[in-house]
Curated annotation (Swiss-Prot):
GO terms for molecular function: ubiquitin protein ligase activity; zinc ion binding. Residues 269-452 form the B30.2/SPRY domain. The gene is TRIM51. Belongs to the TRIM/RBCC family. The lineage of its organism: Eukaryota, Metazoa, Chordata, Craniata, Vertebrata. A zinc finger (B box-type) spans 88-129. GO terms for cellular component: cytoplasm. This is Tripartite motif-containing protein 51. Coiled coil: none annotated. Keywords: Metal-binding, Zinc, Zinc-finger. Zn(2+) binds at C93, H96, C115, H121. It comes from the Eukaryota.
Length: 452
């Protein structure tokens, strides 16, 4: 081939970022092509818009498909480079005068075909160099994809841990104030219990704050290690075929060792401290009422009155639930404009639920709106992500770092005090009190059950 044409051919198959032959090439919407790993590394810290390093155009593209044509052409170019390397005198067997085309997995050496069948190497594993090297590259690319997903997960966890660390002391202070306010409603002889409760809460808060800081530091270290290993694997893929085959085992061992070192996030949780007499103080405000039948659905099970209501949220228990995410809402038939009221709901060991009270205009919408931090919704919710369940309250949206109730949850509505309190009945403990609620009477009970 004419040398000028060869140079054009090689340039067309070269990534403009790493200046090597394409490795898992992708073409972005501006028309320029790059190695996928190079784009990943360049775009790692870009939230939404990314920029082409060639034309500087921005793109939102994230799900990129491999350019098969470019990939095959790059493979041919690497194979041509290998054949040029093997044609040198150093790669001709001195005994048999044949090209060393075989790679011995045991000795990590190049052999000609007769040598690979000799008594010395007969029991070893051999493979043709050009195909073995490309297979190893493909294996490394799969490891790199797995590593990148791990790095992205670590980054999400790091951001979450950073947010938790920044907000943790404020959350503990908020909880201390809620517990103190609850004890102020109790008899004076519980003063000593209150002091012990608050002191334990402060100590737990300080310990968890330290754990969060340590976890954040570990994740930052993991981030550097993961990125470094990703770059090492990329460089290994770009090595000449023989070098790649000889070093493959060592870098694979390093990769597997690194995965064992990646830190997992802390799931902070303050203990549920029981408050003596809490349930007795609420029982005097207990009410019975029903849900509106036309708003109920098959995932909220009613047994007479609200105090006997069960919420079922495990899709495995109901064959009628599809794989599509659905959210079911139901309202109480009664509405409240003033006074104090208390009721209980048996949640069991379920998740993906929310209940509380809402301003009446939510009912008038007559549609399944998203349950989020919108004004006029005063809810306690439980969501499951992977294997971990988290609690939250709304108005404003606050994650609650306390144990998930696994049986019955109580709600206390104080219209004049403008508060909504949630209690873990089994533990006789306060989950949280939403203060300064922007009530617009009438207020109605609301229940939500979501299935995935």
């Amino acid at each position: 081939m004419n040398s000028g044409i060869l140079q054009v051919f090689q340039r067309a198959l070269t990534c403009p970022i790493c200046m090597n032959y394409f490795l898992d090439p992708v073409t972005i919407d501006c028309g320029h092509s790059f190695c996928r790993p190079c784009l990943y590394l360049n775009w790692q810290d870009t939230a939404v818009l990314a920029q082409c390093s060639e034309c500087k155009k921005t793109t939102r593209q994230r799900n990129l498909n491999t350019d098969i044509c470019l990939k095959n052409m790059a493979f041919i170019a690497r194979k041509a480079s290998l054949r040029q390397f093997l044609s040198s005198e150093e790669q001709i067997c001195g005994m048999h005068r044949e090209t060393k085309k075989m790679f011995c997995e045991v000795d990590k050496s190049l052999l000609c075909l007769p040598c690979s069948n000799s008594q010395e190497h007969r029991n070893h594993i051999h493979c043709p160099i050009e195909w073995a090297a490309e297979e190893r590259r493909e294996e490394l690319l799969k490891k790199m994809q797995s590593l990148w997903e791990k790095a992205c997960e670590n980054l999400r966890n790091l951001n979450m841990e950073t947010t938790r660390t920044r907000c943790w002391k404020d959350y503990v202070s908020l909880r201390i104030e809620a517990i103190r306010a609850e004890y102020q409603k109790m008899p004076a002889f519980l003063h000593e219990e209150e002091q012990h409760h608050l002191e334990r809460l402060r100590k737990e808060g300080e310990d968890i704050f330290q754990q969060l800081n340590e976890s954040k530091a570990r994740m930052e270290h993991s981030r550097e290690l993961l990125r470094g290993m990703y770059e090492d694997l990329k460089q290994m893929c770009h090595k000449a075929d023989v070098e790649l085959l000889q070093a493959f085992g060592d870098i694979l061992h390093r990769y597997e060792s690194l995965l064992l070192q990646v830190s997992e996030p802390v799931n902070p949780e303050l203990s549920a401290g029981p408050i003596t007499g809490l349930l007795d103080s609420l029982s005097g405000f207990r009410v019975d009422f029903t849900l509106q039948p036309e708003r109920a659905n098959s995932h909220i099970f009613l047994c007479g009155d609200l105090r006997s209501m069960n919420v079922g949220c495990d899709p495995q228990d109901d064959p009628d639930i599809t794989g599509k995410s659905e959210c079911f809402l139901v309202w109480g038939a009664q509405a409240f404009t003033s006074g104090k009221y208390y009721w209980e709901v048996h949640m069991g060991d379920s998740w993906n639920w929310a209940f509380g009270v809402c301003n009446n205009y939510w009912k008038e919408k007559r549609q399944n709106d998203k349950i989020d931090g919108e004004e006029g919704l005063f809810l306690l919710g439980c969501v499951k992500e992977d294997t971990h369940c988290s609690l939250f309250t709304t108005s404003p949206l606050v994650v609650q770092y306390v144990p998930r109730p696994t049986s019955t949850v109580g709600l206390f509505l104080d219209c004049e005090g403008r508060t909504v309190s949630f209690v873990d009945v089994d533990q006789s403990s306060l989950i949280y009190t939403i203060p300064n609620c922007s009530f617009s009477p009438p207020l109605r009970p609301i229940f939500c059950c979501s299935h995935f």
